[in-house]
Amino acid sequence: MKTTSLTLTFFALSLCLAFTPAQVSPPSPAGPGTAEAHPTDPTTLYLPIVTRTATPSPPPPAWWQPSPGTSWQWQLSTPIDFSFDVDVYDIEMFDNDASVVAALHAQGRIAICYLSAGSWEDWRPDADQFPAEVLGKDYEGWPGEKWLDIRRIDLLAPIMRARLEQCKAKGFDAVEPDNIDAYTNDTGFPLTYQDQLAYNTWLANEAHARGLSIGLKNDADQAQDLLPYFDWALTEDCYVQDWCEQMGVFITADKPVFAAEYSDEISAAQFQSEACPQMAAWEFDAIFKNRDLDEYRLGCP
């Protein structure tokens, strides 16, 4: 399309008007000792002064999120032995009140709340709240304990939520749900991989909703799938049973693996001379315990 000379002339005039500085009235004379606000030249272009504010720090996480290299003690007996110089104590929920958790906090320690999320225990104060239909086969080797039908989240939810509320009310920082690999055991129910995945994910979300960190207990085959939902892992016998490396995905994600080896499977000397170097190579935080989880603890040299 041809452009006429009239159009070009109008366009040039528009540009001139657009870039002509606005006329500014000169300021009043400054008083004695007072600097002028700005020069009086009306053709001077003044740019605003832009200041930057510091980027605010991100908010702290809503729950404890540890990293590898966190030392720990695991004691499910009472009374608690507070003498170990460690970062974390993993202790029983029902048998310890808020004063024990407060004492750990006073020493600058994190308190983990142990509870069973996959089995029924006949000695617990809430044992009568479990409907008969969710109770499965006896848990072999643990008298008074039965597996739970984890498919029935509708029936288990009120009980498990109440337990998590107890953890929170007592001041715990985290929760260790035990027996959350039921689908790999003879429970009396046809539990599947997906059943366990759904239950464990539900548990993690419930813990986080209460500001509680949560650890994946054993359940190595689901470690990759559950990694986004769990903040750390805890293993038993993974060295002697040769499955520790499955939990390495947690280390890769900068989440610790708390590893326990037991005195009924390996000697203390073997633990320190054989298991510890390998645990260090994996960056696991390993301890040597009696299986009844009393106060005895041996760390790596």
Positions of the model-derived regions?
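Intrinsically disordered, low-complexity Ser/Thr/Pro-rich tracts
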Residues: M1-P60
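Glycan-processing catalytic domains of CAZymes
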Residues: P58-P301
